[in-house]
Amino acid sequence: MRALIQRVKHASVSVDGHDVGAIEHGVLAYIGLGHDDNLQSAQRMVDKILTYRIFENDDDPAKYGKLDKNVQQVDGGLLLVSQFTLMAKTDKGRRPDFGGAMAPDAAQDLFAQLIAYAKTQHVDVATGQFGADMQVLSVNDGPLNFLLEVP
């Protein structure tokens, strides 16, 4: 499982011109699911995203400006967007190979479980719409982007 996380000032997802999810200050997370992923790896990924320290600590003068706080500590939102293209193999040729991505039906079920778990761990969780042609708008804060992986 892979996640591309971005610290954002705000982010939103729309489908067919209708907003389906939005957050203010927080983390936009694109989630890619692979063949071997399961509920346990999904829970590990959510835990990692929620505790990954990508926000500055402006409260402690000794840590001022250092990335020392996570999204929960800054009361930020979490926007989860399914993104099978994160599982692409790009090391050969000029066309991505999506063979490593989980099959759509299984991925939809696992992504729904990932969302449900995230909502038990964090107050402000929004999502895109699985399998839809989504338009994602965000204002990247920093910019700060990190590629996270869990087995």
Swiss-Prot record:
Disulfide bonding pattern of the chain: none
EC numbers: 3.1.1.96
An example Gene Ontology molecular-function term: Gly-tRNA(Ala) deacylase activity
Motif annotated as Gly-cisPro motif, important for rejection of L-amino acids, chain positions: 142-143
Keywords: Cytoplasm, Hydrolase, RNA-binding, tRNA-binding
Keyword hit for Signal: no
Catalytic activity of the protein: glycyl-tRNA(Ala) + H2O = tRNA(Ala) + glycine + H(+); a D-aminoacyl-tRNA + H2O = a tRNA + a D-alpha-amino acid + H(+)
Signal peptide per UniProt: none
Enzyme class: hydrolase
Keyword Metal-binding: no
InterPro entries: Daa-tRNA_deacyls_DTD, DTD-like_sf
A Gene Ontology BP annotation from the UniProt entry: D-amino acid catabolic process
Any matching Pfam family: Tyr_Deacylase
GO cellular component terms, A-Z: cytoplasm
Location(s) in or outside the cell: Cytoplasm
Entry function: An aminoacyl-tRNA editing enzyme that deacylates mischarged D-aminoacyl-tRNAs. Also deacylates mischarged glycyl-tRNA(Ala), protecting cells against glycine mischarging by AlaRS. Acts via tRNA-based rather than protein-based catalysis; rejects L-amino acids rather than detecting D-amino acids in the active site. By recycling D-aminoacyl-tRNA to D-amino acids and free tRNA molecules, this enzyme counteracts the toxicity associated with the formation of D-aminoacyl-tRNA entities in vivo and helps enforce protein L-homochirality.
Family statement: Belongs to the DTD family.
Quaternary structure (record): Homodimer.
Domains: entry comment: A Gly-cisPro motif from one monomer fits into the active site of the other monomer to allow specific chiral rejection of L-amino acids.
Protein name: D-aminoacyl-tRNA deacylase
Organism whose genome encodes this protein: Psychrobacter arcticus (strain DSM 17307 / VKM B-2377 / 273-4)
